[in-house]
Swiss-Prot record:
GO cellular component, one term: cytoplasm
Alphabetically ordered keywords of this record: Amino-acid biosynthesis, ATP-binding, Cytoplasm, Glycosyltransferase, Histidine biosynthesis, Magnesium, Metal-binding, Nucleotide-binding, Transferase
Pfam family, one: HisG
Function: Catalyzes the condensation of ATP and 5-phosphoribose 1-diphosphate to form N'-(5'-phosphoribosyl)-ATP (PR-ATP). Has a crucial role in the pathway because the rate of histidine biosynthesis seems to be controlled primarily by regulation of HisG enzymatic activity.
UniProt cross-references to CDD domains, sorted A to Z: PBP2_HisGL1
Name of the protein in its database record: ATP phosphoribosyltransferase
Cofactor names: Mg(2+)
Superkingdom to which the source organism belongs: Bacteria
InterPro entries recorded: ATP-PRT_HisG_long, ATP_PRibTrfase_cat, ATP_PRibTrfase_CS, ATP_PRibTrfase_HisG, HisG_C, N-reg_PII-like_a/b, N-reg_PII/ATP_PRibTrfase_C
C-alpha cells in the first residue's frame, strides 16, 4: 500500500484532511488515531507531527507526505517537492521591537530565538554572520520581553501576533512557505503516488476555477475567446441561430466577475458561472 504522511494537528492538518476527503480518500474519525488504512484506494495514512514528516519521507519509511515547505527545510533532510498545495501560506522573518530599527547585518553576535534553528543558521551562514541561536518550541514572540533574546525569527502569516507583542519584521523573508507534497530525494514518482497527486490537483483546480458558459455572436468569437481561452481552448458549440455560438471555458474563480463584465460588454448573453466539484486537467 502507498504510505502517506499527513499533519496530525496545527494549521495544515484541517485543510489537508479536507482535501483528501474531497479527493475520495478515507479520513480518520478519531483525531487521536495515528493511522488509517484506506483499503479501497490502496493507501495507508499516517498522522504525524508536521515537523517530523520530512524525516520519515527522507528515510524511506513513508512514501510521500504533506507538510510545510519551511518545516521540511528546517529538518535539513533531502526531499523533493512534488506539488505546491496553495494553502498554509506564510513567510519566515526576523522580527524585533517595533520602536527599534534593525538590519540583518546587526544580527552578528546577537541572541535569536526561534523554533526553526536550522533555517536561521543556514541564513546566517549564507550571510557570513555569527549569532547565538536559541531554540524554543513555541511562544517565541515573548522571548524578547523576558530578556531571553534580542530578536526572533518566526513564521508570519497575517502579522497579527507580532503586532500584539509590539514587534515588527525586518529584512527579506528567509523562506516563503506553503503546504507542499514531498517525496524522497531523487526517487521516481510511482503510479500509485501519481494517482494521489492528480486527485489532489483536481481538487485544487476545482477550488480555484469556475466553469463559464455564455452565448455570443459568431462575429465576436475571436474577441471573447481571447479573454476566456480556457486551459487549452474554449469549447465552442453551434446554436439554432447560425450567427450565434455557445462558449464554455474554465476561468480563475477570482476573475469570474470581471470576465463576466467584459463578456457582457462584448455582447455575450446568458453568462453563467458554475462551481467545479472535481477535475482532471
Amino acid at each position: 500500500m502507498l504510505r502517506v504522511a499527513v499533519p496530525n494537528k496545527g494549521s495544515l492538518s484541517e485543510t489537508a484532511t479536507s482535501i483528501l476527503k474531497e479527493a475520495g480518500y478515507a479520513t480518520r474519525g478519531d483525531s487521536k488515531s495515528l493511522t488509517i488504512a484506506d483499503e479501497d484506494n490502496g493507501v495507508e495514512f499516517y498522522f504525524l507531527r508536521p515537523k517530523d514528516i520530512a524525516i520519515y519521507i527522507a528515510s524511506g519509511h513513508l512514501d510521500i507526505g504533506i507538510t510545510g515547505r519551511d518545516l521540511a527545510a528546517d529538518t535539513r533532510e533531502e526531499v523533493d517537492e512534488l506539488l505546491a498545495l496553495g494553502f498554509g501560506a506564510s513567510t519566515f522573518r526576523y522580527a524585533a521591537p517595533k520602536d527599534e530599527n534593525w538590519t540583518v547585518e546587526q544580527l552578528a553576535g546577537k541572541r535569536i530565538a526561534t523554533s526553526y534553528p536550522n533555517l536561521v543558521r543556514k541564513d546566517l551562514a549564507n550571510r557570513g554572520l555569527e549569532a547565538q541561536v536559541i531554540r524554543l518550541d513555541g511562544a517565541v514572540e515573548i522571548s524578547i520581553r523576558l530578556g531571553v533574546a534580542d530578536v526572533i525569527a518566526d513564521v508570519v502569516s497575517t502579522g497579527r501576533t507580532l503586532r500584539q507583542q509590539g514587534l515588527k519584521p525586518f529584512g527579506d523573508p528567509l523562506c516563503v512557505s506553503e503546504a507542499v507534497i514531498v517525496g524522497r530525494k531523487g526517487a521516481e514518482v510511482t503510479a500509485e503516488q501519481s494517482v494521489l497527486i492528480k486527485r489532489i490537483q483536481g481538487i485544487l483546480h476545482a477550488h480555484n476555477y469556475v466553469m463559464l458558459d455564455y452565448n455570443v455572436a459568431r462575429e465576436n468569437l475571436d474577441k471573447v475567446a481571447a479573454i476566456t481561452p480556457g486551459l487549452s481552448a474554449p469549447t465552442v458549440s453551434p446554436l439554432a441561430n447560425d450567427s450565434w455560438v455557445a462558449v464554455r471555458a474554465m476561468v480563475p474563480k477570482t476573475q469570474a466577475n470581471s470576465l463576466m463584465d467584459e463578456l457582457s460588454a462584448l455582447g455575450a448573453e446568458a453568462i453563467l458561472a458554475t462551481d467545479i466539484r472535481i477535475a482532471r486537467i
